[in-house]
Each structure stands twice: as structure tokens, then as C-alpha cells.
């Protein structure tokens, strides 16, 4: 596909928000987390962003209803990467709500191949360039993971700045720069290195998890969080 096959939104070049604009708090709800599925809901004002859809549409719907929301309340869907535990509910979700889907160009290409018809709903984000999505300015940054175009996100709104960094073998320089100064960071802490090495997983899986395109260890996550 050519670049024009995915819609691009104009960047938000401003320095975001003055103190006088703070009318709402940004909130983060974990709908699911772990190897069986991942999904977050971020909200500010009347904007609701679903970040990853790694559980069934039914579970997402039920979780939203517990918060007094419906699928139609969603402003947008953000996808970090195309592994099943982050997109397993996306195809059904696309049939049941009209929210646009934002991800990186390489991930968008993968989704368009794996999910027939999805290409008409995908918006490609460029790394490091903020995009205005509802109340949020969303900035994607690259992660080091074995999925095409994998990324994390910084979301700035009047109610605060949130960074989301999951599924990465290490914290890239771009990630560290973009996440500087956030009010809240949602950070992967996947494993204790020695417990993993001595555990029951097969050798190839241990090597994948420990590799540069695998998952962030508890030690590395703590080290980054302390900076």
C-alpha cells in the first residue's frame, strides 16, 4: 500500500495547555493486563481512549459499562502492536463501534493484512509528532519488540500527562526522551531475571523474553522509573 492509504491527522504543534485550562483530571483504568490480554482506558473530559484491545469485545463492553460508558463513548482506539494479547478483540470491536484506530504505519499495514476491512479505519501516526485526538495530544514512540512498528504512547491533556510503555526489551532513547516529565507512567515490569532463567519455560521462550526485542525485566523497569 502507498502511504496515502492510511489517513494522517495534522500535528498539534502547540506546547499543550496552560494552567488556566485544567478543568478535568486525566484518569487511567486498567481493563486487563497480562499475557492473556491487555487493555487500558484513558479519559479526560468527554474524551475516552481505549489503548489496546487484547480481550474480547464482550469483556471490553462489560468493563466500560461498569464505568458508566458504552462502546459508542470511545473517542479513539490506540494500538501499541499487533500481538494477539493486544488486538484479539479489535476485529469485533471495529464492527460494533465507529471509533478510529491509531497506530504506527508498519503496524497499520500488519493490521490491514490480518483484519479484512480494517484499513478503512486506520490512522497512521508518525513517531515523535503529537496528534490531536479529542482532549489529548498523542505522541507515539518506538519500542524494541518483535512486532512490526511496535510503539508506546505519551498522552498529554489538560488534566495531566500519561506515558504508556509496554512490551519492550529495553527502554529506547526515544522513549526516555518523550516520557520525560509525565505525571503517570504505565510501565511494563515483566519478569525477575533469575526466576525466569530457573523457571519451567522452554529455552527458546526464555531467550525471547530476555532478548533485546523481548520484555522489560522488573529490575530494568525499576531502574527506569527511578530516573
Which residues does each PLM region occupy?
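Targeting/processing segments of secretory and organellar proteins
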Residues: 2-4, 8-9
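Conserved beta-strand hairpin/beta-sheet module of binuclear metal-dependent hydrolase folds
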Residues: 16, 20-67, 151-167, 184
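Active-site neighborhood of phospho(di)ester-bond hydrolases with catalytic His/Asp-centered motifs
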Residues: 51-54, 74-82, 102-105, 163-167, ...
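Active-site metal-binding motif and surrounding structural segment of the metallo-beta-lactamase
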Residues: 58-103
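Short, well-ordered alpha-helix to beta-strand connector turns
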Residues: 74, 119, 182-183
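Metallo-beta-lactamase
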Residues: 105-159
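Cap/insert and terminal regions of metallo-dependent hydrolase folds
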Residues: 173-227
